[in-house]
Amino acid sequence: MSGFIHLNVASAFSGHFGVTRPERMVEAAAAQGIQAAAITDRDGLYGAVKHIGACLQLGISPIVGVNLAVLDDSGNQLGRCVILAHGNNGGLGWAKLCKIVSVAHALPKAIKKRVGIARSALADLLRDEGGCTVLLGPDSDVGLEVLAANRSGAIEALEAWRECLKTPGTLAIEIVSHITEPGTELSVLQARRMLQLADATKTPAVLTNAVRYLEPDDALTADVLDSARHLEALGLFKPQPNAQAWLKPAISM
C-alpha cells in the first residue's frame, strides 16, 4: 500500500507550530512513493515557494493551501479551516489563494490582532469559478459541534457553510484521528462522527493527519513551539495529547 497524499501539512514556516522544513517533508513524501505533496501553513503561504521548488526538483506534484481562522461578519471566531488551491486551471487556484490570504491579513482595526477571513468574504472570492476547496476539520465550527456531541448544531453549522459555498468542489469535511482519548478532540470518536455527518449530508470527505512534523520524535520540538506560542512554560498549558501528528505512511493512515 503506497501513495497516500497528506492534504493538511504545516511546515516550519508555520510560526510556533510546524516543526519540519518543507524540503524535508517533500523528500519524505517522495521516499514513500507519493506522487503529490501538500503544504498548508498557518496564516500564510510562507513555505509555499520552498515546497513547490522541492516538489519540482523531485518530480512530484505540488499542492498548496493555507490554514486560516474564519470569522463571522461580527468578527466572532468560527474555528479554523484548510483551504486548498485547485491545479491545472491556468493559475486560478493560486490566484484565489493569494487573494484569500491577503484579505485575511487586512482585517478591520477592531480585530487587527487576528489573522483570519470572514466566511462571507471567502464565499465572495470562491462564488463563480471556485478555484479552491475548503476543508472543515476537527477545529472548525462544524468539528467543534461534533466534538460536543451536538449533532443538530453540527448540521446547522455545515448548512451555513453549504449556503455560502455553493460552487461544486469548494467544500469537504476533513476526517482526522490522532487516537486520543474517546470524546476528546482528534479522537476516533470525533473522526467517526465527522464521517457520519459527511455521509448523512452527502458532503465529500477526505482523510488527513493534520501533520505538524516529520517523525514522532519531533513532537518534543512541537511542545517547545507550543510553549512559545502560548507564552507559557511547559506544564502550564494544555499540551499535545500524543505524538501522532507526523507524516505517516499509507499503511498507518
Language-model features: locations:
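Phosphodiester-processing cores and adjacent nucleic acid-binding clamps
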Residues: 1-253
